[in-house]
Amino acid sequence: MADFKIVVSDPKTKTYQFDITGAEANQFIGRSIGQTVDGATVGLDGYTLTITGGTDNSGFVMSPTLPGPRRQKVLIANGVGYSAVAKGVRRRKFLRGSEVAPDITQINTKVTGYSDKAIEEILGGGSEEVEAPAE
């Protein structure tokens, strides 16, 4: 069974993190960067999420340019996972493929389709009033 941390970034407000396991997690396996997922898998009914990246259990980032789910050592000059310190410098780095596999730990997503309800309302924290602490 796969366990994922799903990071949902809402461009309008802020970022939320969900832990999913079991059947919900299996819906992400085999999906690639750029594909859409129903938000109901993380409890956000009516929302549409797009996979933007992620990291595996060793911390290697997923690259949208590499096909498949495996880890590869590639020569890169700039892009996901490496920023060159000078022009023309290239380096051999480990990167993960763009496909979600069971050994991925974190999946980054962004909201592309919105529901009538705000995410705060769905999660139950939108209408609460916080009292000032007693002095």
Swiss-Prot record:
Record's keyword annotation contains Ribonucleoprotein: yes
GO molecular function, one term: structural constituent of ribosome
Gene giving rise to this polypeptide: rps6e
The protein's name: Small ribosomal subunit protein eS6
Gene Ontology CC: one annotated term: ribosome
Source organism of this protein record: Methanococcoides burtonii (strain DSM 6242 / NBRC 107633 / OCM 468 / ACE-M)
Keywords from the UniProt entry: Ribonucleoprotein, Ribosomal protein
GO biological process: translation
Pfam family, any one: Ribosomal_S6e
Family to which the UniProt record says this protein belongs: Belongs to the eukaryotic ribosomal protein eS6 family.
